[in-house]
């Protein structure tokens, strides 16, 4: 019995030792990230510093006398820009609490669906408004105001201003009005505003893309048809050696949903093209090497003008693109799901158009042939409904591209310049101008230069509130609405407070300060106008982010840990041993 108990005790001690060793090893492998917590006034003050420094860098770009900002890049030459979004996105702070505040403001600039991709210069306005609202909010909370009541007052004021802006909106349609909006967002450079011509060419729903040009001048290329971003599968299909393109006049168009591998079915399609004495374009998911070889041999030996391209997109998006192309060209998509195959194909299943040009990178269909206009219209309506129902930004973008190809067309703005830096800076401003004009066409315009927000602040005098803290929240917005005019005037080298005071004395809601000329003018008649959608969304987003920051009571950040310096190489007097200091490159 004693030996049995001794044996059990011995095994227990061994087990405990093993457990202790395992626990020791586990604890040594765990990496705990220590946290730093800042509460109340201290945390908000540090975040405010980050917001203020970011806003100071961004506000100098506000037109018409906006200044350049030079941004150092980790690769290549420094970037020169007058684009507030680009400036905001480039800023990071070593202090993590400051960085938290700045990062929340940058979310306004980085939100693709509302500001960056569709509203252009509104991000700069939003940043300035955020700084003004958050600054006053911090002061009020420090003075003992209830943060949640302030937030309710801010929301009440913003809703009132938005209603006022919408009631004053004027819809635009002429190219001159579109050009005026674009000029403002392009920092006053009229020469950069080619987007109004592009919009005239492709319509409201057309696609306008911006690319680097190859000359010193800006160029506009309009594709009156459908363009897909897929080129020829093989260079053997080239018919024009000079420009390295395959050009097909009055071609037949075969659209196949799957990969083509059957040689006999390929021969059947080629016979149809040969009998009708017409060229042939094949659009398919892919072609097997044997099927591709048959096409190339018939092109080289029999003289049949033929070309094959892969269908654009992936998965369901590729299938949808094929059906769009089929609707436009009058073709049927050959799909095995419906029991269709190439061996039973006839001419009625093939589409046509006036001309197709295929390059290494893309294919352009010009002049629709058998496409049914009613069917095209119905498909456009179907896609519009899908855009409204979609909640995914990516899906919406792809649907808009499809709609543009079906209904409007494609325009390409090629931005020229003497250097890469100049082209990049121009592209930033043209992108802003393009996005602002789209927003203006969508929701209309109001007098620009910040005066629409300034005069809307008068409406807040009449607003009744539930308590004193609500009233302070309304006053915070009222004061913030003056900052765009103040900043524009300050950038022009004049006293902003004087300009704001002079305008508030006026009863003319169209009167504003033309900073470019240094005089008071009727903003609408002078062509200084802003899209309602831009300033509305800028105000709503600025108030939202500022309210979040103002009601923050604790900020939790990671404490950066410095890695242990690497030991010097044996016998190495200097050189490599000094590289151990590279480990401490935390924020």
From Swiss-Prot:
Its main location: mitochondrion. Pfam families: Cpn60_TCP1. GO terms for biological process: protein refolding. Residues 1-32 form a transit peptide. It comes from the Eukaryota. Keywords: ATP-binding, Chaperone, Mitochondrion, Nucleotide-binding, Stress response, Transit peptide. It is found in: Mitochondrion. The keyword Glycoprotein does not apply. Implicated in mitochondrial protein import and macromolecular assembly. May facilitate the correct folding of imported proteins. May also prevent misfolding and promote the refolding and proper assembly of unfolded polypeptides generated under stress conditions in the mitochondrial matrix. This is Chaperonin CPN60, mitochondrial. It comes from Brassica napus (Rape).
